[in-house]
Structures are given as C-alpha cells and as structure tokens.
Amino acid sequence: MTFPLGKSFCRLIFSLFSLLVLVSCDRSSGTADGKPFRVNLGTEPPSLDWSLATDHVSFNVIANLMVGLAEFDKNLKPTPVIAKSWDVLDSGKRIVFHLREDATWSDGKKVVAGDFEFSWKRLLDPKTASEYAYTLFDIVNAEEYNHGKITDDKEVGVAALDDSTLEVRLKSPTSYFLPLMTFEVTFPQRRDVVEKHGSKWTEPDNIITNGPFLLSSWKHENEIRLKANPNFFLGKPAIDNVEMMMVNEMTTALALYDQGQLDFLDNHSIPILEKPRLAKSQGFKHVPQLRGEYYGFAVNKKPFDDVRVRKAFAMAIDRSFLPSLLRGGEQAATSWIPPGMLAYNAKIGLPYNPPEARRLLREAGYPDGKGFPQVTLAYNTLEDKKIVAEAIQGMWKRNLGVLVRLENLEWKVFLKRLLNDPPPIFRSGWGADYPDPDNFIKLFASYSPQNYSRWKNSRYDQLLEQAAREMIEQKRVRLYNEAQRILCEVDVPIVPLFNTAESTILNPRYTGLEYNSMGRLVLRNVKAKTD
C-alpha cells in the first residue's frame, strides 16, 4: 500500500473556511460537545472502490465503511469477522469459509458468499485493471483469468457453494492466504450495485456497505462525512458522525487541532519541528508501523541501467542521519522486510561507504561524478519527503560529486507518473496490506504493477513463490533472506531508507481510537469521555 500526500492553496483556504462554518453550526452528532469526530485525511482519496484503491488514504476510509471475512488481532493473527469459522482441507489446497448469518449490508440485505465470489472475480477481471489482482494469483486459474488465457470466470477456483459457504481452491498450500483475508481488496461487493452504477457506484447516493459507518457525503477535494451504521452487526459505533477533512498543509492542520477543530492527526498532518512540543501533550504517541520508505531507480533508463551506479548511489546515503531529521521514531534500514515481521534481518543490505561508492562510480565511467548526466529525484509533495530528499541530494553531491535535480509532485500526479513513466530516481513507501512478509517481497516481483523500477530477476521470483508455498517458518525465513539479498545487495533496484513509526495525537476528550501497525485508522470504538 503506497503512502502520499499533496493539494493546492486555494483548496486549503476553502477547507479551512468550511471547518469554521461547521464548528459554528453542527452540534447534533452525539460526540464531545455535540460535534462530529474530525480527522484529517490530508488529500482526496484517489478511489473508494476497494478493487481499485492502492493507497493509504483510500484504505483508511474504506476500512471504516467495510469489513471482510477476517481482521487481525493484536498479535497480527487473522480472526473471524464475517466468517464465523473456516476449514483448511486437502493439505492446505482448499479452504472453506463459513459465514455468519447476521452480517448485513446497509440496505438490510444479508451478506452472502456470492458477494465475495463476485468481488474477487471482479478484482481478477482484466477489464477492472486492478493493481492488486496479483494478490489472488494463488487461487486456481486466477492468474490465467487475469491474463486473458481463460475467459470463463467459472474456471477460477472460488465459488459460493450456498449463501453461507465460500470455497477457495489453491494451486498449492499458501502460507499467507488467511492473513490476506484481512486486506480490503478481498472484501465483498454487491453485484447489483456495481453493475447498476458503473464507475459511480462508490458515490454516497449509490454505495452499499457493511461496516460500522456509512458514507454520508463526499465533497470531492474538500471533505468526506461518515455516519454511524445503526444496523452494524457487531454493534453501532459510539460516535454518530465523522468528518474527514482534506487539509494538505501541516501547519494549518495542526492549527485546527490546537483550536479544537480537528480531533486526530497523524504523521501527514504534524510538522516535524512541532513533534518535540507535541510529545509532551496528552494523547501524543509514536505507533510502530510495518512500513518502509525507499528510493527506487528506473533500471531500464541510463545511467541506472548500470548496477554499479545503483550501488554507488545506495552506498553514498548515510541512512543513520535520517531519523534525527524526521523525529518521529523512524529506524534506519538497509533491508526491506520491516522490524516486527517474520524474516526481518538488519544485517542484509549495503552499508554507508563513500570510498566504495566513489570507486564504483569511477568504474562505471564517472570519476568524481564527471560526465554524469542530469538526473531527477521525484517525490510527492510533503514536508518530510522534501527534507529527506534535500538531505540525500546533499550526500550525493558531497560523496559522489553528482548534483541531482529535485522535483515534487502532487500525490495523484505522482502516482500516475510512477505507473506510466517512472523518473530516474523516485521516492516511494510501502505499508503492510496484510501482516506477512509476502506482502513486502512480492512488491518487486516481475509481475507486480507496483514494481515501478521495472526490475526483473527470475531467481527472485522463484524464491518468493517457494516461500509462499513453504509452511515451515524457518525455511520461509531462509528463502526471504536470499530474496532480500538479491534485492538490496546484488541488483539494487531500490535503496531502503528507514522504517517508520506513526506520530499521532488524539484529542484527550476521546478514547478508543486505534491506529494499528498496519497503518489503519479504526474509528468504530471511539467514544467521548464522560467526565
């Protein structure tokens, strides 16, 4: 799952004006002082269609509108939600999910197994063009259907046996398949709603959901409003109304929080220089995340088609300096799988070594940076991304003699650029979609649409496929270690920079908010304190 953010000044002023009007007018929501619970998304969600969404902002909205077969507990193990139980059969090659009888959609209709079958086949349908279709490729004939090798979706190994029973047939035992059921792309969808409204099915007047909140309104580029679902089968949320603002400027978002006009901020709304002050405040936390930041190289473009150049740029970065700039609990990283996840290994990766970096660059034909072409590092518009980019720009100039041009882009434009024509160097990040190393390692598979470097390595692909089939953890770790060495030491299409923690602050008049290690903002247990 990718992480942003960015927006224009005029929208910022409009959002601020809207907030001031709402503060003066809205007193009927049942939360503290009758106000809605207000959070800042920071930007417009690119999509609320969970077959198409790819980013942190979109998934944080969807996670409060929808639930799926499972969610993960505090130990990152899948636990039933719409599924009341499941059976793992045929040595792990067949899984049968048994659904609850009381799970309903917001229009009162029962959630049935066919809603999952439709959703998963829509995710795989090549016409949908989902970037996350590959997550289901372990299902029999799923990849073949997605690639157009078969056209009959009845041949795909997922089927509703009846309203309460969903059968999944896998090509082979798959170690991460149950954790995958916590990921929003596997959540059910209503065929009648999607087919009736087409691309507009996620608009407030059309969408039907099954989670704790309903989509009340969506003023694009401005705000999203949610209201409690009174018929949510796990119980109505304590707060009646939620407002999700889209204030891009960190300083403005923090000012609104200080004035009581926002109730929760995360990293994307907290200026770095304000973190020491806020750390003394009630409600401030650093929440460890299963998330990493990296710089990627367009390996099909000169000069980064030369692995020596990629290694030189990697070894010229002093990652240990970056956490002191960001002040948010970050941890420098040379490997890709994050701390807290199976197969994390801090010993993997290229160390900071300027003399070796200069030697490699000289060997590649650019002694002391002479003759090196003008290249650009692109990043999405956000304060912390700029600070890191400027720091690393200085390291490359100092250690390699190369001045890299910086370019910042608004989030939607940046994502489109990565997909269509990646810059020579680009910033990106990844947060866990489901709590398994497969989710991190598979990002750079040759078939992954989010492999923006366009790098391919057949041995790497083989290793991640073997690890997915392996059910013994120690053997999985060895396979992932070898894959990480190829990624971070041998071919180096990316440079891991740091693993993140999320700086958050919650209005102390509220309790129950959950911001978990998967980067999800969970609001269904939020309530106003009574004292």
Regions found by a protein language model. Give the residues of each.
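C-terminal motif of bacterial Sec signal peptides marking the signal peptidase cleavage site
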Residues: 23-24
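N-terminal lobe/hinge region of extracytoplasmic solute-binding protein
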Residues: 40-90, 206-209
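Local pocket/hinge segments that shape ligand/substrate recognition
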Residues: 42, 129, 133, 264-354, ...
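A structural "hinge/loop" feature
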Residues: 43-60, 82-83, 109, 131, ...
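Aromatic- and charge-enriched surface segment that lines or borders ligand/interaction sites
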Residues: 85-135, 167, 256, 303
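Gly/Pro-rich hinge or "lid" segments in bacterial periplasmic/extracellular proteins
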Residues: 142, 153-159, 163-164, 170-237, ...
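Detector for C-terminal structural segments
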Residues: 219, 316-345, 383-393, 415-531
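Short helix-initiation/N-cap motifs at beta->coil->alpha
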Residues: 243-255, 270-271, 406-416
